[in-house]
A protein has these predicted regions:
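Negatively charged, low-complexity tracts enriched in Asp/Glu with abundant Ser/Thr
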Residues: 1-24
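Short, intrinsically disordered low-complexity segments
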Residues: 10, 42, 83-84
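Terminal alpha-helical segments
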Residues: 16-21, 27, 57, 76-80
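A short, structured beta-strand/loop element
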Residues: 23-57
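Short linear sequence motifs
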Residues: 11-14, 29, 34, 60-64, ...
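Intrinsically disordered, low-complexity segments enriched in small/polar residues
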Residues: 1, 16-19, 39, 65, ...
Length: 86
C-alpha cells in the first residue's frame, strides 16, 4: 500500500512516503460531493517544516482517486526536487 488512510470527522487523511520523504494528503468526506478536493504536503525529515505541493485542479470522483492523484503529484514533486540536487 502506498499510504494509510485515517478519518478525522469529515476529513480523510492519508500518510505515505517516497524516497525518504513523508507525504500527507487530506480530503473531505461529505455526502453529495461531486468532486473530492485534495491537499498535499511533503516533509523531508521530522525536523523540517511541511511544504505544500501545488496540485492541479482535476475532477476526482472518489477519495481513493483523490489520494492516488495527490500521491502521484507528490512523488513527481519529490523526484524533481531530488533531480535538482544532483
Amino acid at each position: 500500500m502506498k499510504y494509510e488512510v485515517s478519518t478525522h470527522g469529515h476529513r480523510l487523511e492519508a500518510i505515505g512516503a517516497h524516497s525518504g520523504h513523508r507525504i500527507r494528503m487530506s480530503t473531505l468526506s461529505a455526502q453529495g460531493l461531486e468532486t473530492w478536493p485534495v491537499s498535499v504536503y511533503v516533509r523531508g525529515s521530522e525536523s523540517e517544516a511541511e511544504v505544500k505541493v501545488d496540485v492541479p485542479r482535476h475532477h476526482l470522483a472518489s477519495p481513493t482517486e483523490a489520494f492516488d492523484f495527490g500521491y502521484q503529484c507528490a512523488t513527481l514533486w519529490i523526484d524533481a526536487l531530488d533531480h535538482r540536487r544532483t
